[in-house]
Structure formats: C-alpha cells, structure tokens
Amino acid sequence: MVPRLKEKYEKEVIPALMEKFQYKNIMEVPKLEKIVINMGVGEAKENQKVLESAVADMQLISGQKPILTRAKKSVANFKIRENMPIGCKVTLRKNKMFEFADKLMNVALPRVRDFRGVSSKSFDGRGNYALGIKEQLIFPEVEYDKIDKVRGMDVIFVTNAKTDEEARELLRFLGMPFAQ
C-alpha cells in the first residue's frame, strides 16, 4: 500500500512545485531523500540500561531497529572514552520515511504543549531541515507508564533541494506546520 504522504507528494506537491519554481523537467523537483532520527543519551556512560530503553523507545517510534552511535574521541570533561556508546540513530528511507513524516506532522507535533508551529529558520543552507523534539511522549506509540525518563531527539529531513527556499516549500506542501 502506498503511504498517504507519498501519494500526496506525487499527485499534489510535484505539480505545485513545478508551477511555483518553473521547473522544465519533473526530475528537477526536490524530493525527500531520507529522515534521520538521532537521540543522544548522555547518561549512557554510567548506566547501559538507559541506552537500552532509549533504543526501545526509538524502535517503537520509527518502526526500525536503531544503531548505536559511539564517541569519536575521548573527552575527559564529559567522562567519555573513544568508542563508548553514547546514543542511537535511525535512518528512514522510502515508504517508512513517508509514514514517519506523516505521523510526525499530523499526529505528534499537534500534541506538543503550546504548539505554535515549527521554526522556519532551521535550514542548513543546503536544503536540509533539522527539528528538535523535547520529549518522546508526543508519539502515540510511546506509553506514558512504560518510560523511565523523558528524552528528546533530533529529526533531520534530508532533501535533494538546491536551496533552502525550495526545501521550505517542499516541506510546506507536504504539511509541515511552520510558524508564521
């Protein structure tokens, strides 16, 4: 079954972007390449159980098993050594990516307290958008009673857009609730 957001992209977003940016070829239209969800778990250095529960939460949210991220080098002030596991991340592509984006924009973000829209300034200059989420409870899969600690995560939308303006329009047409 084709995800709802992918269908919307093909039927509505592509024609709208072609008209707005005057593309001559359908292959010029920017598209979502992947979504990377990253969770840094600072307490993992003392307690491995914390990391396991973070991995379990992320697996529920993304529907895919996360990989552990490790420290690149030792930092004495943070009490970490090289190669210590300090977080986890998931890279979503194709249908899982569209399903996650749909769930994030239409279910999870509206559940954030005092939500007025996401910042439209978080583009990196190359058409990628980063979004910070303060708590994993906004996702319907995570049950309040089952979590040990409220954890945040970063969600990065990687597009093949050439400019931030193109990427912003792509995400806006897909339904990203940008603050006015």
Swiss-Prot record:
The keyword Coiled coil does not apply. Keywords: Ribonucleoprotein, Ribosomal protein, RNA-binding, rRNA-binding, tRNA-binding. It holds the Pfam family Ribosomal_L5_C. GO terms for biological process: translation. The keyword Zinc-finger does not apply. GO terms for cellular component: ribonucleoprotein complex; ribosome. Gene3D superfamilies: 3.30.1440.10. InterPro entries: Ribosomal_uL5, Ribosomal_uL5_bac-type, Ribosomal_uL5_C, Ribosomal_uL5_CS, Ribosomal_uL5_dom_sf, Ribosomal_uL5_N. GO terms for molecular function: rRNA binding; structural constituent of ribosome; tRNA binding. Belongs to the universal ribosomal protein uL5 family. Part of the 50S ribosomal subunit; part of the 5S rRNA/L5/L18/L25 subcomplex. Contacts the 5S rRNA and the P site tRNA. Forms a bridge to the 30S subunit in the 70S ribosome. This is one of the proteins that bind and probably mediate the attachment of the 5S RNA into the large ribosomal subunit, where it forms part of the central protuberance. In the 70S ribosome it contacts protein S13 of the 30S subunit (bridge B1b), connecting the 2 subunits; this bridge is implicated in subunit movement. Contacts the P site tRNA; the 5S rRNA and some of its associated proteins might help stabilize positioning of ribosome-bound tRNAs. HAMAP family: Ribosomal_uL5_B. This is Large ribosomal subunit protein uL5. It comes from Clostridium acetobutylicum (strain ATCC 824 / DSM 792 / JCM 1419 / IAM 19013 / LMG 5710 / NBRC 13948 / NRRL B-527 / VKM B-1787 / 2291 / W). The lineage of its organism: Bacteria, Bacillati, Bacillota, Clostridia, Eubacteriales.
